[in-house]
From Swiss-Prot:
Protein source organism: Brucella anthropi (strain ATCC 49188 / DSM 6882 / CCUG 24695 / JCM 21032 / LMG 3331 / NBRC 15819 / NCTC 12168 / Alc 37) (Ochrobactrum anthropi)
Family per record: Belongs to the UPF0434 family.
Xref: SUPFAM superfamilies: Trm112p-like
Source organism phylogeny: Bacteria, Pseudomonadati, Pseudomonadota, Alphaproteobacteria, Hyphomicrobiales
Database matches in HAMAP family: UPF0434
Lineage top rank: taxon: Bacteria
Protein's recorded name: UPF0434 protein Oant_3286
Entry-linked InterPro entries: Trm112-like
Length: 64
């Protein structure tokens, strides 16, 4: 894949389809931490081996 279709380890097309399982809101990819961020739920879902782990029990709580 080229740079236009991939962001770090996440395919941009996949990122456009994924939503937070709790809020159904959009996600942002944080390449530095390898996480998908749900601002609305204040959770960070891990990405392991290029695979998003979309389980709330696996998510890290974001603190402000």
């Amino acid at each position: 894949m080229d740079d236009k279709t991939q962001t770090g380890n996440i395919d941009v097309r996949l990122l456009e389809l994924l939503v937070c399982p709790l809020t159904k809101g959009p996600l942002e990819y944080d390449a530095e931490h390898g996480e998908l961020i749900s601002r609305k739920a204040k959770l960070a879902y891990p990405v392991r081996g290029g695979i998003p782990i979309m389980l709330p029990s696996e998510a890290r709580s974001l603190t402000e």
